[in-house]
Amino acid sequence: MSDIADRVKKIVVEHLGVEEDKVVESASFIDDLGADSLDTVELVMAFEEEFGIEIPDDAAETIQTFGDAVKFISDAS
């Protein structure tokens, strides 16, 4: 797993309180990991802070899964 994926996974585990093995590429933050809309906003803010990037609102809406987050951050870095 890439450094970005490891860091994203750590943020997801810490913010959502889920088991690390549940955070897989296809895991939906809402459907699979139990996040609500506020959790997803907090995740995006945590990703922005961790990686020093800005995620526009329209892009944030497309980040639905762990894999989406890793891809967006990889492309933005």
Curated annotation (Swiss-Prot):
It is found in: Cytoplasm. GO terms for biological process: lipid A biosynthetic process. Pfam families: PP-binding. It comes from the Bacteria. Keywords: Cytoplasm, Fatty acid biosynthesis, Fatty acid metabolism, Lipid biosynthesis, Lipid metabolism, Phosphopantetheine, Phosphoprotein. The modification O-(pantetheine 4'-phosphoryl)serine is found at S37. The keyword Phosphoprotein applies. SMART domains: PKS_PP (SM00823). InterPro entries: ACP, ACP-like_sf, PKS_PP-bd, PP-bd_ACP, Ppantetheine_attach_site. GO terms for cellular component: cytosol; membrane. 4'-phosphopantetheine is transferred from CoA to a specific serine of apo-ACP by AcpS. This modification is essential for activity because fatty acids are bound in thioester linkage to the sulfhydryl of the prosthetic group. One of its GO terms (molecular function) is acyl binding. Pathway: Lipid metabolism; fatty acid biosynthesis. Residues 2-77 form the Carrier domain. The keyword Phosphoprotein applies. Carrier of the growing fatty acid chain in fatty acid biosynthesis. NCBIfam families: acyl_carrier (TIGR00517), PRK00982.1-2 (NF002148), PRK00982.1-3 (NF002149), PRK00982.1-4 (NF002150), PRK00982.1-5 (NF002151). Belongs to the acyl carrier protein (ACP) family. This is Acyl carrier protein. It comes from Roseobacter denitrificans (strain ATCC 33942 / OCh 114) (Erythrobacter sp. (strain OCh 114)).
